[in-house]
């Protein structure tokens, strides 16, 4: 192996490690906001609302929402790119499982009995974890959550790279 190949392989492994770390941070952050029920990322809040409407688990609801967005993404780009679809699903599956697991774990701590001020701080910490994790995994640039891919598609295919407008459209 040449030095260049070794560097590329090392970089690839490091990027996957950062993706794994970001999945853990992201899942804990989302689980904190779900348990606190004081505010969350908009897509997670929507999934939690659906979870309360039907008999599916939170994990199944999050995964189902991810699959729906994967289909929407394929429609928006007018083609099926299997690498992109598989990447979105590879992100969504552990993401859904981990949020369900961490939510159950956090609920058992009795954290919801804390005073409101402390719960607000915990909820804000959860939102900050989500922001940090999203930044990490997007920099790893391996696979995306379907909702983040959706925003990127809107931004670059339809809004000439304007991130601000893409974020607003993404939430509609």
Report residues per predicted region:
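Core subunits and conserved enzymes of cellular information-processing
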Residues: 2-172
